[in-house]
């Protein structure tokens, strides 16, 4: 069970406490929301942090009734209260074990969006399916090609090369700057990495011969780069064996480089020989209709082009008022930086997407009224004062738009945030929502639609999209810098206040005592300042200290990452590297299968109209060669580890799990890196222990840390636990989907 902050309408709180409620710190009070857990009874449960309850032994006082109901596949917790006010924790009486894991399976797709090849395959399959079913298919209007004069063609060609060379120069500058940051050990944010990936794909597309120059040059200079720039990898890679240290560094860098090159391959658009080049023009006309002329496009146009405004693209370009409105609608914290608001919205949208798949599998009719209300409320739809038939109808409409029509969740939520009348059709609601999107979203979507259809993208459009994203990155970095300056100013102000208080108290002392006091302060200045700081916070704002302790800063996330690397080094474990290598091989296999399927579906007679670019083919060969080198390094490291293990004493029993560590081990490792209060270390470690058995999987912790590190946000311990659970559930769903795909392929082979 995960604690979530409650909305303003959910409770009546004192003003001071209400301000802190969105941050997830309610003192003696907390709200356990069952919106995302989809419990049987949608009542507000009043607990403090993690509640100690167990089946049969749970009881309560003051007209509360609670019980556990265990079904075939679910475990429900039901609580009914006759009191609308908040009840302190003392009102609950609980016996039994300290924690009870309630495992209700939320699953969603991984954070990465579909690649260009996967989107092209989906678009092609969707067209063929609609043609077979006889449904409406969007077909662009046939425009008579006007033959241009020689002078006009020369001007167009000159403009094309001008924008192409300008794009090449700007891409080279940005790539060099980001590469320099990577070499100096700086981590790229999610937005910067996406920009770097797109730029590398553009460079290889503009100059395919770069594959023969850049990639071998990078591989050859890897040992030199590791010597010249030791900060590329954390200090935890330093071991007693120089050879082992060198091999591990090479393994890590080669693996990251291979993964990045494979992502670059998937980012490169395919070439469609049959493409007429009208898609970009059609999209511009469509957006001009809904933004300027007021003309209503067809339903097929609206549904087709709405798919392009993906969650990541939409959220990254929304203004702050729009982000705040979405957070309030979804009952999320609406205070914080834009980056933080986007992060928590992304996590919530993934949860909603997972729930949609589960509800579609079970059927809307199987949900109770309470579950229907919870599901509709979580999606920003009316849940109170609505009949049961209306609840089922609007939820079915949502599932049809989201899962069948593949409309992004962010657009659907935005349409609900605008409180449009229910009489509007879904297409009209989407049209009105698209009108509110910033102009910057349209430019990126225009490039995306051409890439998906396999058409040639104009260099000018690519250049505008690149400059626009670069401006957004600069603005984001400025916000982070302002936030750091503000935090530093607040800390300096607090230190000055503490020093002023000490001087005021010292004035009243006698001269002799004053000298002793001054020497004592000089000797223990750091400890005294920390103590006085804590006492000051307790005296003036008791709630703020709780918030301070619950928040995990960026520095503490880095410290947690270093601690995990040290523990992995102690266990001599290469599990993470093996998993990443297998995942990379799976990505390559999936890419090749998708590519082959696209060629078969788009084949015109005996001629293949879709083909890879030259740069993509050359990069694929390089990645396959690097995978062979990575396999050799892993085998060499494993051979060395086996040799060392034979020399060790065999009397000690092996650990219960290769990657499992105790909470105490993680806390001790974090203590060695940075001085953090014991209580906070314990809370961080317990947040990572999902099933509360005292054991933590290091690899799962590393995945959570990498996700948070890319976003560069400060989050609470409860959110860390939520992310931990979400990533584990995504892995389970991915395995389930792979098994289903395998069965479908086997069934298709049997039919053929």
Curated annotation (Swiss-Prot):
PROSITE patterns: EF_HAND_2, LETM1_RBD. The keyword Transmembrane applies. Homohexamer. The chain crosses the membrane at residues 206-226. Residues 113-205 are mitochondrial intermembrane. Residues 249-518 form the Letm1 RBD domain. It is found in: Mitochondrion inner membrane. Keywords: Antiport, Calcium, Calcium transport, Coiled coil, Ion transport, Membrane, Metal-binding, Mitochondrion, Mitochondrion inner membrane, Potassium, Potassium transport, Transit peptide, Transmembrane, Transmembrane helix, Transport. Residues 443-509, 550-639, 720-752 form a coiled coil. One of its GO terms (cellular component) is mitochondrion. It is a single-pass membrane protein. GO terms for molecular function: calcium ion binding; calcium:proton antiporter activity; ribosome binding. It catalyses: Ca(2+)(in) + 2 H(+)(out) = Ca(2+)(out) + 2 H(+)(in); K(+)(in) + H(+)(out) = K(+)(out) + H(+)(in). Gene3D superfamilies: EF-hand. Plays an important role in maintenance of mitochondrial morphology and in mediating either calcium or potassium/proton antiport. Mediates proton-dependent calcium efflux from mitochondrion. Also functions as an electroneutral mitochondrial proton/potassium exchanger. Required for the maintenance of the tubular shape and cristae organization. The keyword Ribosomal protein does not apply. Residues 1-112 form a transit peptide. Residues 676-711 form the EF-hand domain. Belongs to the LETM1 family. This is Mitochondrial proton/calcium exchanger protein. Residues 227-752 are mitochondrial matrix. GO terms for biological process: calcium export from the mitochondrion; calcium ion transport; inner mitochondrial membrane organization; mitochondrial calcium ion homeostasis; mitochondrial calcium ion transmembrane transport; mitochondrion organization; potassium ion transport; protein hexamerization. InterPro entries: EF-hand-dom_pair (IPR011992), EF_hand_dom (IPR002048), LETM1-like_RBD (IPR033122), LETM1/MDM38-like (IPR044202).
